[in-house]
Amino acid sequence: MKVLISLSSFGAAETARHGQLWCTELGRQAGADGVEVRGELLRDAAAELPAMAGLAAVYSSPEGLWTHDGHLDEAALARGLHAAAVLQAPRLKMAIGGFGDQSHASLVRLKALLEGAPQVRLVIENDQTATAGTLPALQAFFAAQAQAGMGLGMTFDMGNWHWQGECPLQAAEALAPYVCYVHCKGVQRLPGKWVAVPLAESVAPWRAVLRALPASVPHAIEYPLVGDDLVAVTRDQVAFIRAAREAA
């Protein structure tokens, strides 16, 4: 199993100060097997993406695949595929956005567009929104894409379900056949909101969730990595994820 680091884990301020290339090197020093580059944290994509070519396992697009009214956003997909290609990242991660019943017909077009970019595999993540972060929404999407003969995989974010009041264990049991990538994210409840925390500090049943998910797929840290010695902090968390997965 490979352990990756989603570079958002270092925080917007840290990545803005140093850049994602610096964070990528930090992750390498800490023993991570790769990183997920975050589109929303790029300061100068035209310069940063080529500089990280060959160093990223995943490119994460902040854009949804479908607009709020259910139309396939071909421009957003094209931007994501281009960024992943420049990075030489084998995976592009996106959420489904406003996918609904009216969107099913556009899966044929999506399939054709993806066949035109065979070097990049699209994976779908559950985000924190009502349209793209609930179990019914994701079940409906994966059933529809399977019927369309697409075979898309899922990025299962362990923590995001809580933002929509969903049970992560129920989601893991239902969606495990599609999961090809796991975002490890613990959660705690603060007044009026959920926040991401390391798995060891989580109030969620993360061990049971891990047991329900495929063990061999890449697992990424996506919770705050902070401390005076970021390499040491990150190294400890990489080791924690490896041990937690083995124990599950």
Which residue stretches match the model-derived regions?
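Histidine-acidic metal/acid-base catalytic patches
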Residues: M1-G31, A78, H82-Q88, R109, ...
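Structural motif corresponding to the early beta-alpha repeats
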Residues: V3, Q29-V108, R121, N160, ...
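Conserved glycine-rich "GG(E/T)P / GGGxP" loop and the immediately following alpha-helix
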Residues: A13-T15, H68-L72, T131-G133
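Short, aromatic/basic amphipathic alpha-helical patches
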Residues: A47-M52, L113, D236-F240
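Hydrophobic, well-structured mid-protein blocks that either form specific transmembrane helices
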Residues: G97-F142
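Intrinsically disordered, low-complexity segments enriched in polar/charged small residues
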Residues: R43, G98, N126, Q188-L190, ...
